[in-house]
């Protein structure tokens, strides 16, 4: 069964958890197993979110970093926190072999660009 694991950076500001909840709820309309975890500062951690997916029966997991570009978190921290080798992409859990695939960072997307235009216009209209 497919599990989706959203990765958020995290912050000492508690509102970050609200963002994770909202994105997980949105994706739950399309996928039955969705969890989110943070790289640092907040709970659930990435390993806690992974454990939740595994306990619910996921045997294939797509990890979706909510990051704009590759960097240390993408290349090193996410695989390390999930317990996978960059080349292997498999873990063992209670005798089961679990495949983990990490999606590319968000990068440039016109839909994200549209959100940026919307934010600029909202801010301008509210302040000028």
Curated annotation (Swiss-Prot):
Q: Which reaction does it catalyse?
A: Co-sirohydrochlorin + 2 H(+) = sirohydrochlorin + Co(2+)
Q: Where does substrate bind?
A: 43, 68-73
The pathway this protein participates in, as annotated, is: Cofactor biosynthesis; adenosylcobalamin biosynthesis; cob(II)yrinate a,c-diamide from sirohydrochlorin (anaerobic route): step 1/10
UniProt EC number: 4.99.1.3
Please, which domain of life does this record's source organism belong to?
Archaea
Q: Which residues are named in the active-site annotation?
A: 9
| Disulfide links within the chain | none
Per UniProt, Co(2+) binds at: 9, 73
Q: Which GO terms describe its biological process?
A: anaerobic cobalamin biosynthetic process
Broad class of enzyme this protein falls into:
lyase
Q: Which GO molecular function annotations are given, in alphabetical order? A: cobalt ion binding; sirohydrochlorin cobaltochelatase activity
Which InterPro entries does the annotation name?
CbiX-like (IPR002762), SiroHydchlorin_Cochelatase (IPR023652), Sirohydro_Cobaltochel/CbiX (IPR050963)
Kindly state which keywords UniProt assigns to this record, in alphabetical order. Answer: Cobalamin biosynthesis, Cobalt, Lyase, Metal-binding
Family per similarity comment: Belongs to the CbiX family. CbiXS subfamily.
Which proteins does it associate with, and in what oligomeric form? Homotetramer; dimer of dimers.
Summary of the function given for this chain in its UniProt record: Catalyzes the insertion of Co(2+) into sirohydrochlorin as part of the anaerobic pathway to cobalamin biosynthesis.
This one is known as Sirohydrochlorin cobaltochelatase
